[in-house]
Amino acid sequence: MKVKIELSGGLELLFDKKKVHEIEFSDKNEIPLKDLILYMRDNLLKERSELFVVDDTVRPGILVLINDADWELFGGISYNVEDKDTIIFISTLHGG
């Protein structure tokens, strides 16, 4: 199973300044979005995890899109990510 992760709005700075990550899970057909977020925290995130994850979900102020649609349309954190899905994380938190 391959999943494409896109980061913007400054989140890419926490992930080694990479906007796009391709992840492959060879032993799975689907993975809960919550598990994907925790995988990202544990394996891809390079600094300041509190700016991405709070209480095992994305921090408030981060917009999550699944294949270009709001994740709430798919059940939010309980969505099962499938092969070839694109998950986009956009930070709406900015300094002023």
Swiss-Prot record:
* One CC-aspect GO term: cytosol
Asked whether the UniProt record includes tRNA processing among its keywords, one would answer: yes
Q: How is it modified after translation?
A: C-terminal thiocarboxylation occurs in 2 steps, it is first acyl-adenylated (-COAMP) via the hesA/moeB/thiF part of the MOCS3 homolog, then thiocarboxylated (-COSH) via the rhodanese domain of the MOCS3 homolog.
Record location of the Glycyl lysine isopeptide (Gly-Lys) (interchain with K-? in acceptor proteins) cross-link: 96
Q: What keywords sit in the KW lines?
A: Cytoplasm, Isopeptide bond, tRNA processing, Ubl conjugation pathway
Tell me where in or outside the cell this protein is found: Cytoplasm
GO process annotations (BP): protein urmylation; tRNA thio-modification; tRNA wobble uridine modification
Residues with 1-thioglycine modification:
96
| SUPFAM superfamilies linked to this entry | MoaD/ThiS (SSF54285)
Q: Per its UniProt record, what InterPro entries does this chain match?
A: Beta-grasp_dom_sf, Mopterin_synth/thiamin_S_b, Urm1
Q: Name one GO molecular function term.
A: protein tag activity
The record ties this protein, via CDD domains, to: Ubl_Urm1
* UniProt superkingdom: Eukaryota
The protein's annotated pathway: tRNA modification; 5-methoxycarbonylmethyl-2-thiouridine-tRNA biosynthesis
Function comment: Acts as a sulfur carrier required for 2-thiolation of mcm(5)S(2)U at tRNA wobble positions of cytosolic tRNA(Lys), tRNA(Glu) and tRNA(Gln). Serves as sulfur donor in tRNA 2-thiolation reaction by being thiocarboxylated (-COSH) at its C-terminus by the MOCS3 homolog. The sulfur is then transferred to tRNA to form 2-thiolation of mcm(5)S(2)U. Also acts as a ubiquitin-like protein (UBL) that is covalently conjugated via an isopeptide bond to lysine residues of target proteins.
Q: Which PANTHER family does the protein's record reference?
A: RURM1 PROTEIN
Family designation:
Belongs to the URM1 family.
The protein, known as: Ubiquitin-related modifier 1 homolog
- Gene assigned in the entry: urm1
